[in-house]
A protein has these predicted regions:
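Acidic, proline/glycine-enriched N-terminal capping motif
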Residues: 1-89, 94, 210
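Conserved small/polar residues in nucleotide/adenosyl-binding loops
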Residues: 217-223
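Short amphipathic beta-strand starts and helix->beta connectors
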Residues: 38-44, 88-98, 125-127, 165-172
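Acidic, low-complexity central loop/insert segments
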Residues: 64, 100-216
């Protein structure tokens, strides 16, 4: 059995007594205080999720025509600083992965499911699209919940829904997969623990992937295999 990959927050999760599981080849927190309790954190207040197992690729804006050809949405005409949910398809029209694009003036951030990251990278390689893999040099933290935006507003600029923003060391979008409002923040690994500690001082609770799965299943949100 191959060794599981870990995010930069692995030791942090252990210090929080998280229940760790094998999730698409990554050792990830399933729960901290219990799945149902964490689900209610998000529904009633705010929680944060480590979703750094998800693939993060930076692509040059100059390749947008070629990228547009590979997905089932119109990316090239999307306004800059917007986020787009889409699906990469094969030549036969089958789904390879459901993904999120964050569009900026000079580049694109592509976020894909952990189980399909290598498939997406291979698909891009085959189609001669170059990218920078940020998966191991950054973390991705989702802050979600009824009060999430009020809390985040104390820390950073709040973009419109489905919009993106760059500020200081943060690259983020007002997106998520729980059915509640919030943001997903990409941040250098060296800064993540300080960022999370700041969230916790404002009452944001750690939540595992179990409660995240409950949230999107409860709302019948789609996902390609596992995230």
């Amino acid at each position: 059995m191959s060794e599981l990959k870990t995010t930069s927050l692995y030791d942090f999760h252990l210090s929080k007594k998280a229940k760790m599981i094998d999730f698409a080849g990554w050792s990830m927190p399933f729960s901290y205080d219990g799945t149902l309790k964490e689900h209610h954190y998000v529904r009633n207040s705010a929680g944060y999720f480590d979703v750094s197992h998800m693939g993060r690729l930076r692509l040059s804006y100059s390749q947008i025509e070629e990228i547009n050809y590979l997905i089932c949405s119109e990316l090239k005409n999307l306004e800059n600083t917007k986020a787009l949910y889409s699906i990469f398809t094969s030549e036969q029209g089958t789904a390879i992965d459901d993904v999120i694009f964050w569009k900026f003036e000079d580049d694109l951030i592509l976020i894909c499911n952990a189980s399909n990251t290598n498939k997406i990278k291979s698909h891009l390689d085959i189609n001669s699209i170059t990218y920078e893999d940020l998966t191991l040099t950054t973390d991705l933290i989702a802050i979600q919940g009824k009060n999430a935006i009020n809390i985040i507003d104390q820390i950073m600029t709040i973009p419109d829904k489905f919009s993106t923003y760059k500020e200081n060391n943060y690259i983020y979008a007002r997106t998520g997969y729980t059915g509640e409002d919030g943001v997903e923040v990409m941040i250098d690994t060296k800064d993540t623990v300080d960022f999370i500690n700041m969230l916790e001082t404002k009452g944001v609770k750690p939540c595992g992937l179990g409660s995240r799965a409950v949230s999107y299943t409860h709302l019948t949100l789609p996902t390609t295999q596992v995230v």
